[in-house]
């Protein structure tokens, strides 16, 4: 089953987590504090992101009970490619409209 990245990233808390993880790895507790949600809520958000392949987790070497979460930027490549297509389409449409208006004003 394909992952609906829009559904995964529709939640503002998950988008904030993705932004934070884009800077560096975090433990779940650090993310809870940074975002301002409870630990159980953060666990649910991280589960969604893990299942979608947006983040990975690994045990820390010094304490196997702690997990570090990292962003998988490549997981967002499909979304980025789609957004690039949409942007190119609208750039073309707006350029065409601009040329039409300029011709109308000159004529």
Where does each model-flagged region fall?
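Beta-hairpin "wing" of winged helix-turn-helix
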Residues: 30, 50-65, 70
């Amino acid at each position: 089953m394909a992952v609906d990245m829009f559904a995964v990233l529709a939640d503002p808390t998950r988008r904030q987590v993705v932004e934070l993880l884009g800077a560096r790895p975090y433990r779940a507790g650090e993310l809870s504090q940074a975002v301002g949600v409870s630990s159980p809520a953060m666990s649910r958000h991280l589960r969604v992101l893990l299942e979608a392949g947006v983040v990975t987790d690994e045990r820390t070497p010094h304490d196997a009970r702690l997990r570090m979460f990292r962003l998988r930027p490549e997981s967002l490549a499909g979304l980025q490619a789609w957004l690039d297509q949409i942007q190119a389409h609208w750039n073309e449409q707006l350029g065409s409209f601009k040329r039409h208006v300029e011709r109308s004003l000159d004529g």
